Amino acid sequence: MTYLSSNQLKQYEDQGYISPIEVLSSSEALEARKEIELIEKKMPSEIDNAGRYNVHLISPKLDSIVHNSKILDAVESIIGKNILVCSTTLFIKNPNEQGFVSYHQDAKYIGLEPHNWVTAWVALTDSNENNGCMKMWPKSHLNIRDHNEKFNKGNLLTRGQTVENVPEDKVKSIELKAGQMSLHHPRIVHGLSLIHI
C-alpha cells in the first residue's frame, strides 16, 4: 500500500497539490506511451483533439493505469475508499507542435460539488520546463476564481477557460519523470506552459 505521508497530506491541504509521487515504473510508462501511439495509428479518431477523453475505456493497458494500486492508494489517502473515476484525459505533445493549457481551475467547469475530489496527473514521458510542464499556483485552491473563455490557437482546453492575472512569481513548475504523478485539488489554479519542441 502506498498511502500518502502526513507531510504529503499537509502539503495538499496547505498548498493544494502534491508532487512528485512514484506510481509507474519507467517500463510501465513506456508501455502506456507505446499503447497510445498504437491507438493513434490504428484508431486515430479515438484519440484526436476531441477524442482524447476516456481512452482507458478502449484500452486494457491504459485501464490498468486507472486501476493502479499506487494511484488508488494515494487518492484514497485524500478522499477515502469511495473512488469513482469521472474521466481521463490525454494531453498529447506531438513533435513540432506548440500548445499550452491556460491557467484554470478544474472545479469551475467540471461541475462536481462539493469539491472533495482530486485530479491525478500521471506523466508518461518526462515533463519539464524545456518541453512544457504543469504549473501550479500554490494556495490558490482556497476559493473559486473568475474565468474567461478564450479560444486561443494552441490551447489544449476545449473552451479555453482562463484565470487572468496569475502571479507568475508565485507559480511553481511541477516537473515529473515518466511514471511519476501529481495530485491536485479541484480548485487549484494550474496550467501547462507553452510547449517548445
What label would you give each PLM region?
Residues S25-S26, F91-K93, K108, S127-E129, ...:
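Short, solvent-exposed loop/turn segments at secondary-structure junctions
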Residues G111-E129, E175:
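Short, conserved beta-strand element in jelly-roll/cupin
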Residues M1-L112, N148-E149:
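Non-heme Fe(II)-dependent double-stranded beta-helix
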